[in-house]
Design a protein with these regions (language model features):
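Sequence-level detector for compositionally biased, low-complexity segments
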Residues: 2-213
Length: 213
């Protein structure tokens, strides 16, 4: 049985501040620059970008065709060339760690492509409701916005990969240092919800969302 998630909380103020800063950058990346954007700290507003000399690029010969006849059906990766192929097109400068990047055990790029490829049908498993007819309403060719989305995603994944050594180092230092216990957090009332976040009590004359019979 897999143990539950455990989050070590450092009692070292400096390490805590470092973790906060790192967390802000992760959220900035996950939200494509919409949250925690602070230009002076290297987090400008808008889609995050890798340095030009290492950012993914699509050369003239790698442009993904927008012809219905060339709608991509496959996504593949060439390790030697660090090239990501989408149908007949391709993107250069894609590191192996970006191609293999997973979230919850699923390869991000394969998942992303599965919702944009020519055949998007998925098998009905168990008692799950059959797919809606609305799922058949889709473009019959590769859209320019798909390419933009792909470049944005590759940049974000690349920047997340770059953070991994820093995250691992910080975690090691946090675990090796003093930690806050659940007892200390409770004694400091750190786990209590502030009154403003609690649901308001129902006043007289107000109807409940769920009416009683």
């Amino acid at each position: 049985m897999q143990p539950g998630l455990r989050i070590p909380l450092t009692a070292d103020p400096q390490l805590f501040r470092e973790a906060v800063q790192l967390g802000r950058r992760v959220i900035w990346l996950h939200t494509y620059g919409e949250r925690f954007s602070t230009p002076k700290e290297g987090r400008p507003k808008g889609p995050p970008r890798l340095p030009k000399d290492s950012a993914p690029r699509i050369p003239a010969k790698g442009v993904i065709s927008d012809s219905p006849d060339a709608m991509p059906e496959t996504i593949t990766y060439d390790l030697a060339q660090q090239r990501l192929s989408i149908g007949d097109g391709y993107v250069e400068r894609v590191p192996p760690a970006v191609w293999n990047y997973e979230v919850s055990g699923k390869q991000v790029l394969r998942q992303w492509f599965s919702y944009r490829q020519k055949d998007r049908e998925r098998p009905v498993m168990g008692d799950r409701r059959p797919p809606s007819k609305l799922e058949e309403v889709q473009a019959n060719h590769w859209l320019a916005e798909y390419t933009t989305d792909l470049i944005d995603l590759l940049n974000v994944l690349g920047l997340l990969v770059e953070l991994e050594p820093q995250q691992a180092d910080l975690l090691q230092r946090v675990c090796a240092g003093p930690l806050l216990s659940i007892t200390e957090l409770n004694e400091a009332h750190a786990l209590e919800l502030p009154a403003a976040s609690l649901p308001k009590k129902q006043g007289k004359g107000e109807q409940s969302l769920f009416a009683e019979d």
